[in-house]
Amino acid sequence: MSIVITDLCKSFGSTPVLQRFTWTVDRPMVLMGRSGCGKTTLLRIWLGLESADSGTVTGVETPAAVFQEDRLCPQLTAAANLMLTGHGLTPQDAERELRALGFTDAELALPAARLSGGQKRRAALLRALLCRDAKTLLLDEPFTGMDAELVEDAVAATKRLAGERPTILVTHDRTAADLLGWPVREV
């Protein structure tokens, strides 16, 4: 399975953001570029949250996504948030994955509304990666807001859990891209 983008164009008013963008993603890959170059717009088009001016996107089948805004259920714990999409995921499995990304027992007991920004990012990333039904993954700046020492653990979890699914990880962080070791497409 592949995500195929063909001649995608998008402008905001008279400002072009994407011009005849073409790309085939059949494995985990990184989309890099400076802030404001259209990376998030591209993800929003892939997910059907925004329309392109022209061009086509095919193959975004049953996606799981991490957005720049964390979209956790605030009243649930981080583990309960993971279990929402991780059908068959046990509470013990969810807590084990969260502990691997630095969660303590006390933090595991908190509702998502009381977690720090970095904790929410880690939980949102794991929720997407553990989504058993997802055939594609779209991850928008998933390591933003994480402490530097946790980024390596988050990268390792991303590589392990994404597997070979077509995955697009958007970042402007060259260090994270290098740690992933995935092919990079510059925008």
Which residues does each predicted region cover?
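Conserved ABC ATPase signature
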Residues: 111-115, 119
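Hydrophobic anchor residue at the start of the ABC signature
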Residues: 125-126
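Q-loop/switch helix immediately C-terminal to the Walker
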Residues: 69, 75-93
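Walker B catalytic motif
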Residues: 111, 141-142
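A short, flexible loop at the N-terminus of ABC-type nucleotide-binding domains that lies
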Residues: 1-21, 51
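Helix-to-loop junction immediately C-terminal to a conserved catalytic motif
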Residues: 47
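Conserved ABC ATPase "signature" region
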Residues: 91-107, 129
